[in-house]
């Protein structure tokens, strides 16, 4: 079934086009429907970027903190830590 991959890449394309509302909805749908997908951790990082771009600092910080805690050794955790420091410093 390629539907989960399609949802993930659709959300990424919305993010790339700076269509943050659709990116947010699509990442959330992807996460709710695919909690064990191999791109799940990446989607948490990307959704936190969406939250930050929408001015939703608290949601971005909370999501990044939970992503780092749940996936401490994931390659996206390094980016998540950097983004968290950046958001907090703003």
Report each predicted region and the residues it spans.
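Acidic, polar-rich low-complexity tracts and alpha-helical solenoid repeat scaffolds
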Residues: 1-90
């Amino acid at each position: 079934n390629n539907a989960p991959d399609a949802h993930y890449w659709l959300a990424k394309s919305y993010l790339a086009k700076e269509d943050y509302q659709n990116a947010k909805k699509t990442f959330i749908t992807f996460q709710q429907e695919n909690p064990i997908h191999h791109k799940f951790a990446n989607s948490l990082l990307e959704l936190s970027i969406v939250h930050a771009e929408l001015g939703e600092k608290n949601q971005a910080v909370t999501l990044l903190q939970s992503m780092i805690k749940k996936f401490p050794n994931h390659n996206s955790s390094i980016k998540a830590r950097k983004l968290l420091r950046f958001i907090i410093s703003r």
